[in-house]
Amino acid sequence: MDYPHWNEESFFANRKSRKIGKISPMIFSEGGVKFGVCFGYEAHFDVFWRYFMQKNVGCVLVPCASTFESGGRWRELLKMRAFTNSLYVIRANRIGEAKFGESEFKFYGESFVVTPGGEIANELKNEEGVLMCEVDADEIAAARGLWKFRKNLVSRGLL
């Protein structure tokens, strides 16, 4: 978001004159599931989700530092991403207050887990806490078997 008080795009420090041909977000495996990491701003762009689908990622971790009462938008965006990609999404949002120069920001928390079916499985409200969930490889496989989004894209040469 390119606001005078919060230019999130500048945090990525990519020269605007340089074309970026490839992305390579972090991916690692644990317990038979591939995990990807997608920072808050990146979650808005299809290219990251396409990459995770190509790599057969089963859970995307989305660390954020969101403010401006944007929680409803984040919930809808990440529920849709989880469902259309048949994977878990775990959003960890900063909570608390911070001052940057003359500006003060209130980070509202509201971390949550979304299932491959697009449902909120567990969440924290506007409070500090520990959020636990089980990432179930069988649930990922069941969602992929039911909707077949990835399979249909691959069969059409689109992925």
Predicted regions and their residues:
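A conserved C-terminal secondary-structure "cap"
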Residues: 140-159
